[in-house]
């Protein structure tokens, strides 16, 4: 989206292809899952964002295949010719080939996934009040989170606050002490991308909030409502969250030889996929090893994607204007820092030489993320939700809702699943 914004006035026709008609703000997706904010507060319709742009076109479709020789992109609505193709489809959850975990674990990469997790959490609480056995009740009240990165830490903290501030009031006939939150990490510390001090502080915060943190544990399976570890230990649960890793989304038609670690496309210093004409990749989909400070590739975080988009927009304008490679600007990542919030008045922040923990870090986290949200209305909605939650000790969005798709939509989706699978590229 940043790339499309920065190409404004470049004399180019910009076509955005996405299977959803909205942009989402990933850093706050966990707050949807924990019933803290409404999905619409961090979701922004593309057509609304670009409605004043005469050079911009949006098509809701899935990219199916690309013919890099003919410069044709095959989508679920047909084929599209291109001069320059930029892949910015991000990443998906990596289950490391474990089919049982993929089938049963709940990921949290997208707004729909977060809404599904929220429904599951609330439904399990309702069921725990009426189930027939103590064994089932404990399975419903145990929450297992796999992955000790920022997402795992933040959702663990949010759920711990739900247990403390919401459950006793919304479910007065439930013994909230039966609710256990487990955070499983294969490594030896939380927030591995941050300093040891921040990792230790995050650990202390979560332990103080009652989260059971287990290091050096590798989850190998999920069977019979049990998370199974490599050492043979088990945790019974029906709420199994997997935030342990990601892999780049694939693009059929581009040979696997162009992929590197994490299935990311290998790109040069200008984000061109090596060996392909006019094809670029940015964000989580690319592996760029030309930056001296990041010889193994950049971290898969939003700031990298935003900065790459800005740099690529400048270079595309030059390329389209006939400039040669010497005029282009190589990408160098400017690390603006890392931060994670654990709960009320609890956060860790690292920005340059600044190291902050606790209340000030929490305020800084709030300000940074609030500024990053698109639109004044959305900023106000999120701010009001946060203020209400802070004053009342109460989350605001706790409805269980399941979307019902009209028959026409279901039939159209079924048709699209069996058409435009690449046959057009053979014509």
Language-model features: locations:
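Beta1-alpha1 glycine-rich phosphate/pyrophosphate-binding loop at the start
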Residues: 1-59, 64, 150-193, 241, ...
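Cofactor-binding loop segments of dinucleotide-utilizing enzymes, especially the Rossmann-like FAD-
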Residues: 17-19, 89, 148, 186, ...
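A Rossmann-like FAD-binding core segment of flavoenzymes
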Residues: 54-65, 160-269, 273-275
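FAD-site-proximal beta/loop scaffold in flavoenzymes
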Residues: 103-133, 225-228, 234-307
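C-terminal, flexible cofactor-proximal segment of oxidoreductases
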Residues: 313-427
């Amino acid at each position: 989206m940043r790339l499309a914004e920065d190409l404004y006035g470049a004399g180019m026709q910009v076509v955005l292809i996405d299977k959803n008609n909205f942009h989402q703000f990933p850093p706050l997706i966990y707050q949807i899952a924990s019933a803290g904010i409404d999905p619409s507060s961090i979701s922004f319709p593309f057509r609304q964002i670009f409605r004043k742009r005469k050079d911009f076109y949006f098509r809701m479709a899935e990219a199916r295949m690309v013919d890099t020789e003919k410069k044709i992109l095959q989508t679920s609505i047909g084929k599209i010719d291109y001069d320059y193709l930029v892949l910015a489809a991000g990443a998906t959850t990596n289950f490391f080939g474990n089919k049982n975990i993929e089938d049963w674990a709940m990921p949290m990469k997208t707004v729909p996934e977060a809404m599904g997790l929220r429904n599951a959490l609330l439904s399990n609480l309702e069921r725990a009040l009426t189930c027939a056995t103590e064994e089932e009740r404990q399975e419903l009240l145990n929450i297992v989170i796999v992955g000790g990165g920022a997402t795992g830490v933040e959702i663990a903290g949010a759920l711990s606050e739900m247990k403390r501030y919401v459950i006793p009031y919304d479910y007065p006939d439930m013994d909230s002490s039966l609710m256990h939150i487990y955070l499983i990490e294969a490594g030896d510390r939380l927030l591995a991308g941050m300093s040891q001090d921040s990792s230790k502080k995050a650990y202390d915060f979560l332990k103080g909030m009652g989260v059971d943190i287990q290091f050096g544990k590798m989850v190998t399976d999920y069977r019979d409502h049990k998370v199974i570890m490599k050492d043979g230990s088990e945790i019974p649960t029906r709420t199994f969250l997997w935030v342990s890793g990601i892999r780049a989304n694939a693009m059929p038609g581009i040979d696997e030889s162009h992929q590197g670690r994490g299935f990311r496309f290998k790109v040069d210093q200008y984000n061109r996929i090596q060996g392909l004409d006019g094809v670029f990749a940015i964000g989580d989909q690319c592996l760029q090893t030309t930056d001296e400070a990041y010889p193994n590739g950049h971290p898969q975080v939003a700031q990298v994607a935003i900065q790459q988009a800005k740099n690529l927009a400048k270079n595309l304008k030059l390329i389209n204007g006939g400039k040669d490679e010497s005029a282009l600007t190589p990408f160098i990542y400017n690390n603006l820092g890392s931060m994670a919030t654990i709960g009320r008045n609890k956060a860790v922040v690292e920005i340059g030489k600044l190291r902050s923990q606790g209340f000030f870090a929490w305020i800084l986290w709030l300000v940074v993320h609030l500024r990053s949200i698109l639109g004044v209305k959305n900023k106000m909605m999120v701010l009001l939700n946060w203020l209400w939650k802070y004053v009342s000790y109460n989350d605001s969005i706790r409805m269980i809702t399941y979307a019902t798709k009209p028959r026409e939509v279901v039939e159209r989706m079924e048709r699209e699943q069996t058409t435009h699978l690449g046959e057009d590229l053979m014509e």
